[in-house]
């Protein structure tokens, strides 16, 4: 958060303060423990994939770096809270009426497969590596397993929003 040259990283500080605030809203131990586990495992898979294929590296050159893994469960909980806030506000914005489910089906089947295609294009130079094949199969499998497009597209939107700030940092 504080650079040794004396400067403070305001984007990182603000992002972590936002995530800390999200952690205090609607706490449910049972639900949160599941999300913490999913975040840790999912983050571990993502970091394993990215560092083993050398799509990205960290200054420590660890593959994956253990110090980054605790950020994933925290971000997962924050995304869950943000998604629930967004979900509640959607119906309010629609004048108190429930947003039609077809809108979410359309949004899901346009946005999420487009994201998967973009990720495959991003990793195109590593498609011959087993890690990329595993992650591609996971992305396609999760995409096809959608049972609640409203929940999933709201989670996708919240995760994308928070991810922009985390990645920009």
Predicted regions and their residues:
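Aromatic-rich, lipid-facing transmembrane alpha helices and their immediate juxtamembrane interface loops
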Residues: 1-169
């Amino acid at each position: 958060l504080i650079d040794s040259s004396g400067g403070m990283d305001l984007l990182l500080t603000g992002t972590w303060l936002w995530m800390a605030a999200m952690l205090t809203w609607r706490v449910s131990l049972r639900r949160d423990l599941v999300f913490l586990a999913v975040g840790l495992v999912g983050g571990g898979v993502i970091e394993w994939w990215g560092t083993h294929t050398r799509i990205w590296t960290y200054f420590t050159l660890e593959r994956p770096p253990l110090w980054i893994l605790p950020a994933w469960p925290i971000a997962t909980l924050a995304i869950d809270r943000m998604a629930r806030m967004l979900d509640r506000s959607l119906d309010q914005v629609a004048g108190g009426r429930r947003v039609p489910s077809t809108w979410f089906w359309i949004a899901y089947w346009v946005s999420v497969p487009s994201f998967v295609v973009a990720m495959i294009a991003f990793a195109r130079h590593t498609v011959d590596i087993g890690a990329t094949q595993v992650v591609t199969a996971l992305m396609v499998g999760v995409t096809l397993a959608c049972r609640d497009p409203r929940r999933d597209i709201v989670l996708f939107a919240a995760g994308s929003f928070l991810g922009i700030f985390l990645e920009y940092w």
